[in-house]
């Protein structure tokens, strides 16, 4: 008779803890790129729609991920991803 293999992998942190850490990281990143009043409004909408549930947590994670993805895709001025650094003369003169 076949037996299930023993779990020999490393211990994983609980899903709920990981989800809350992800939400915290997304919130910290979002406040660097979006007005707080927008984020507050989003939080209010999620709370009114889902209440204090895991479905609400999952919804706000999904929305924040989409917002940040689109924001970076369009071209965030704060992002250094894919931007080559160019030095400019302070007086506007170009170097040839």
From Swiss-Prot:
It is found in: Virion; Host nucleus; Host extracellular space. One of its GO terms (cellular component) is host cell. GO terms for biological process: biological process involved in interaction with host; DNA-templated transcription; monoatomic ion transmembrane transport; negative regulation of DNA repair; protein homooligomerization; regulation of DNA-templated transcription; symbiont entry into host cell; symbiont-mediated activation of host apoptosis. The modification Phosphoserine is found at residues 79, 94, 96. Keywords: Activator, AIDS, Apoptosis, Cell cycle, Host G2/M cell cycle arrest by virus, Host nucleus, Host-virus interaction, Ion channel, Ion transport, Modulation of host cell cycle by virus, Phosphoprotein, Transcription, Transcription regulation, Transport, Viral penetration into host nucleus, Virion, Virus entry into host cell. InterPro entries: RetroV_VpR/X. Phosphorylated on several residues by host. These phosphorylations regulate VPR activity for the nuclear import of the HIV-1 pre-integration complex. GO terms for molecular function: molecular adaptor activity. Residues 1-42 are annotated as: Homooligomerization. Pfam families: VPR. During virus entry, plays a role in the transport of the viral pre-integration (PIC) complex to the host nucleus. This function is crucial for viral infection of non-dividing macrophages. May act directly at the nuclear pore complex, by binding nucleoporins phenylalanine-glycine (FG)-repeat regions. HIV-1 lineages are divided in three main groups, M (for Major), O (for Outlier), and N (for New, or Non-M, Non-O). The vast majority of strains found worldwide belong to the group M. Group O seems to be endemic to and largely confined to Cameroon and neighboring countries in West Central Africa, where these viruses represent a small minority of HIV-1 strains. The group N is represented by a limited number of isolates from Cameroonian persons. The group M is further subdivided in 9 clades or subtypes (A to D, F to H, J and K). Homooligomer, may form homodimer. Interacts with p6-gag region of the Pr55 Gag precursor protein through a (Leu-X-X)4 motif near the C-terminus of the P6gag protein. Interacts with host UNG. May interact with host RAD23A/HHR23A. Interacts with host VPRBP/DCAF1, leading to hijack the CUL4A-RBX1-DDB1-DCAF1/VPRBP complex, mediating ubiquitination of host proteins such as TERT and ZGPAT and arrest of the cell cycle in G2 phase. This is Protein Vpr. The gene is vpr.
